[in-house]
Every structure is written in structure tokens, then in C-alpha cells.
Amino acid sequence: LFTGRPDGRNVGIAARAKQELEGFVTEPDHRNLEYVTDPQADYDGIAEALLAPRRQLRRWLMEQGLTLLPGSTLSLGDTERFERSDPDNPYHSLIEATYGTAVVTASIHINLGIDNPAELFAALRLVRCEAALLLSLSASSPFLNGRITGAHSQRWLQFPLTPERVPLFLDHQHFITWTNQQIQAGAMHN
């Protein structure tokens, strides 16, 4: 989520939101923040679990003359600099060095809420096969620094930097083994 003024100007308040609002977490660039919900095993509570924190955040932001900005409008901000939420965090240094300063899109990370590892990896394979469709329906950030990029999504232009070939994991051990191999080869970071 991106926060700012009603005119679209970005104002980073992630650290304060994390301190004052339950469930909110900071991102490497403090203009962006996220919240974490508990896993849901059925669909009935998902909409409220996703929307309740946003309502809480909107009320909190209104008290400060701020609002939520759609992810596609962060491009109105300055992408020439990275506004670190924690200058001493080595992970944040890695993100800045790897992706640069043009982190301009918001996202939802989906927790599938599946306890059984075999069922979880079957679901992950399905999501992975449908990922391009899901991204095309959800990712929308065609602007950068107030200009049209020519792409549907800035996110697609820069994320994710993964190894060229990622398998459809058979099970949890396959995932662990492959990930450890990538870390040892320097293709991924942990």
C-alpha cells in the first residue's frame, strides 16, 4: 500500500503505521507498507480479513490529512531515490541494490491457508500455472515518474529476478533442495 496526500504526492509513514496499527509491517522503502492477515481456510472470511485493515488504515491516515494511493500512482513520486525505512537493515540494502529505486507497484501476497504440505504444493503448482493470468488481471502500474512506460505493468518489467528456470515443485523437500542449490550458486538470496 502506498500512502500520501490527496493530490497524489507520496508521503512515507510505514514505520509510524507499524508502531501504531496492529498487523502492519514496513517495506524497504518507507513509502510502501503492508499488512499481514491470519491464514483463512475458507472463503467466507477472506474479504473482511483483507478489507478491515484497509479501513483502519484509511481512518488513521485521514486524521493526518493523508490517504491511500493506488499502486499505479507512485510514479508521481521520485523514483530516483530509495527512501529507506531502516537504513541499517542489510535486506533493505539488497532490495535497493537488486531492484533499484523504481519500486512502483503494490501487491497482495496470498496465503493459501492449507495445512497439508501435499495439498499446498498441488495448489502452488496450480497458482504458478495461472500466475500470468492473475498478474495480468491485478498488476496495473503503467506509469513511471509521470510518464507512460509502454507496459501494462512496471512490476512485470522488473520483478521478479529469479533464476531462468524454476520447476513446478513436486513437494516441500524438492522446494527446499532447489532453493538451497540456488542460494549456494548465488542465483537467489536468503
Residue ranges and their predicted role:
Residues 36-38, 109-113:
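Residue-level recognition of well-ordered beta-strand positions that form the cores
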